[in-house]
Curated annotation (Swiss-Prot):
Compartments reported by the entry: Virion membrane; Host cell membrane; Host Golgi apparatus, Host trans-Golgi network
Name this polypeptide is given: Envelope glycoprotein L
Name of one Pfam family that matches: Phage_glycop_gL
Comp. bias regions, Basic residues: 155-167
Length: 167
């Protein structure tokens, strides 16, 4: 049970301490190669959007750090919740009260999302945001939601730049 128990405890700790926070702003799930996702041990928190937020779109954010920059990666909330339900259920009688509270939350939110599931709530692209990260003189384009020491919204920059051209 060794590594599996460590894995389950780590995920549960991350989720129980962070599931009360709403993932704001909402984000768009981007198709990505697995190699571009943060490594498991690089994820320092997971934030779920509740069913009454983000227009009912089931998303979650993985937060990881790269140097001084915290990167939030938008992921499919159904998949992550379902995976974690399976992990906590495998704990069986080893599940702590925190594990059981997490399981209750995950199952409740999955049920709520399933009831409201339709073409609109399946499309996270309405929350798409393009940003530029600027840190220590280096810029990096990324689609999604990112927070760091210095960030600037690309769409805001484009609007400001377009306004200057019109003068």
């Amino acid at each position: 049970m060794g590594i599996f128990a460590l894995f389950a405890v780590l995920w549960t700790t991350l989720l129980v301490t962070s599931h009360a926070y709403v993932a704001l702003p909402c984000c768009a799930i981007q198709a990505s190669a697995a190699s571009t996702l943060p490594l498991f041990f690089a994820v320092h928190s997971i934030h779920f959007a509740d069913p009454n937020h983000c227009n009912g779109v089931c998303i979650a954010k993985l937060r990881s750090k790269t140097g001084d920059i915290t990167v939030e990666t938008c992921v499919n909330g159904f998949n992550l919740r379902s995976f974690l339900v399976a992990v906590v259920r495998r704990l069986g009688s080893w599940a702590s009260q925190e594990n059981l509270r997490l399981l209750w939350y995950l199952q409740r939110s999955l049920t709520a999302y399933t009831v409201g599931f339709n073409a609109t709530t399946a499309d996270s692209s309405i929350h798409n945001v393009n940003i530029i990260i600027i840190s220590v003189g280096k810029a990096m384009n990324r689609t999604g939601s990112v927070s760091g020491s210095q960030t600037r919204a690309k769409s805001s920059s484009r609007r400001a730049h377009a306004g200057q051209k019109g003068k």
